[in-house]
Curated annotation (Swiss-Prot):
InterPro entries: Arg_succ_lyase_C, Argininosuccinate_lyase, Fumarase/histidase_N, Fumarate_lyase_CS, Fumarate_lyase_fam, Fumarate_lyase_N, L-Aspartase-like. One of its GO terms (molecular function) is argininosuccinate lyase activity. Keywords: Amino-acid biosynthesis, Arginine biosynthesis, Cytoplasm, Lyase. One of its GO terms (cellular component) is cytosol. It is found in: Cytoplasm. Transmembrane segments: none annotated. Pathway: Amino-acid biosynthesis; L-arginine biosynthesis; L-arginine from L-ornithine and carbamoyl phosphate: step 3/3. Its main location: cytoplasm. Belongs to the lyase 1 family. Argininosuccinate lyase subfamily. GO terms for biological process: arginine biosynthetic process via ornithine; L-arginine biosynthetic process. Its EC number is 4.3.2.1. It catalyses: 2-(N(omega)-L-arginino)succinate = fumarate + L-arginine. This is Argininosuccinate lyase.
Length: 458
């Protein structure tokens, strides 16, 4: 079968041009989605009376054969056929003959590829969604395991205040919950059928787009054919969702990399998820975490790639849009793999029971104690700042300071001041919902199961 557009041309396409313009090397990932669309379009052609029942049956049998070949990895993808659409159509012609030429009636590759891409994104959002759900569940399980363990919380990578390990882990669960919600929002906009828009002006045949939408499980159809074939907003939104996931994975990986060092010694990583050094026998390197962190930049770059591609395109379709798929496929596979790895890490990570919280983490508690003694917070802050300087100069932890020493800075300190200078007291003194107080953390753990109902909205 000659090229679909060869009638206009007197010369064969240069082999160099074929190699430069082909997309089958990567858009073969859309093969099954393209076939789904072919089956739906075939139904619309029959209903509109554009093809006969005999042609319909012939085409349908050929498409089923192609589907089997693809599923068995027996389909030959030919660069000379340009893209996935023409590869399938050419193979259909080989199988059934002239009827194959009728399938493309009433559509363009412009609306065809847009629909394929939406089908791909919907499918992969569901896959990513399930992995996010599994990751959140692992974080909750790990939080339950360490719901009594205290660690230092950080600002500016400086020890700040004591927090429960469970509270720390649940902070990431909240971030991934937002990622799940963003995916739901993106899914709703992706869930629009653009098939039937043609090259840009629509189809000349009375094709039932609502029938096609129903068959392909789209909740709505596009309203403007020009916008439909030009639109890649939905892909950008999807890519931002992936970038946000990558960011949260990277931040968590960064923490674990730091916490795993000899300088911190907060966590232990399983041998099965680490690698060694070719020269230093003692090394146990967190390579998986480092790659999760590194791959975040790759996902960001794919988002920027797509946005830069789109920024200067005139309406409507331009061949530049062929370049949307590789960044999307790469970012998708990167996120799928990174999520799988992080799930394994959370499942097997171990927090050490003897985490050293540090000597100065209770300074804020001392300041708040003075506030309870009717000293304005700014004044209390200054007083405790002087106490901290004294403790550092004399190499004393705050817990060891006597009432007499504290009274040198403020007579408001009573004997009960010693009761609050402990990590456990600091945790218990937190009174706001969402704080690291054990009761509130336990409520957050219990709420997590009900929040999974959000995950069923797709």
């Amino acid at each position: 079968m000659s090229k679909a557009w060869s009638g206009r041309f007197k010369e064969d396409t240069s082999k160099d041009v074929e190699l430069f313009t082909e997309s089958i090397s990567f858009d073969k990932a859309l093969a099954m989605y393209d076939l789904e669309q072919d089956f739906a379009h075939l139904e619309a052609l029959l209903k509109a009376g554009v093809i006969s029942k005999d042609s319909y049956e012939n085409i349908k049998s050929g498409l089923k054969k192609i589907k089997q070949e693809i599923e068995k990895n027996e389909f030959y993808f030919d660069i000379s056929k340009e893209d996935i659409h023409m590869n399938i159509e050419s193979r259909l012609y080989e199988l059934i003959g002239e009827d194959a030429k009728k399938l493309h009636t009433g559509r363009s590759r412009n609306d065809q590829v847009n629909t394929d891409l939406r089908l791909y994104l919907k499918d992969h959002i569901l896959k990513i969604f399930e992995l996010l759900k599994a990751l959140k569940q692992q974080l909750v399980l790990k939080a339950k395991e360490y719901e009594d363990l205290i660690m230092p919380g950080y600002t500016h990578l400086q020890r700040a205040q004591p927090v429960l390990v469970a509270h720390y882990l649940l902070s990431f669960k909240e971030a991934f919950l937002r990622d799940s919600q963003r995916l739901i929002d993106a899914y709703r906009r992706i869930d629009t059928l653009t098939l039937g828009s043609g090259a840009l002006a629509g189809a000349d045949f009375p094709l039932d787009r609502f029938l096609e939408a129903s068959i392909l499980n789209f909740s709505k159809i596009s309203r403007n054919s020009m916008d439909a074939v030009a639109d890649r907003d939905f892909a950008i939104e999807y890519m931002f969702c992936l970038s946000s996931i990558a960011m949260h994975l990277s931040r968590m990986a960064e923490d674990f990399i730091i916490f795993n060092t000899e300088e911190f010694k907060f966590i232990d990583l399983p041998d099965s998820l680490c690698t060694g050094s070719s020269i230093m026998p003692q090394k146990k390197n967190p390579d998986v975490l480092e790659l999760i962190r590194g791959k975040a930049g790759r996902v960001y770059a794919n988002l920027i790639n797509l946005m830069v591609n789109l920024k200067g395109l005139p309406m409507t379709y331009n061949r530049d849009l062929q370049e949307d798929k590789e960044p999307i496929f790469d970012a998708t596979n990167t996120i799928l793999n990174s999520l799988k790895m992080m799930i394994l890490i959370i499942k097997d990570i171990r927090f050490r029971q003897n985490i050293e919280a540090g000597n100065l983490l209770l300074a804020t508690d001392l300041a708040n104690y003075l506030v309870e003694k009717n000293i304005p917070f700014r004044e209390a802050h200054h007083i405790v700042g002087n106490i901290v300087a004294y403790a550092i100069e004399n190499q004393k932890p705050l817990e060891s300071l006597t009432k007499e020493e504290l009274n040198n800075f403020s007579k408001a300190f009573d004997k009960d001041a010693k009761d609050i200078i402990s990590k456990e007291s600091s945790i218990l003194r937190k009174k706001t919902y969402g704080s690291t107080n054990k009761d509130f953390v336990k409520k957050q753990i219990d709420l997590s199961s009900s929040e999974e109902s959000i995950d069923k909205n797709l």
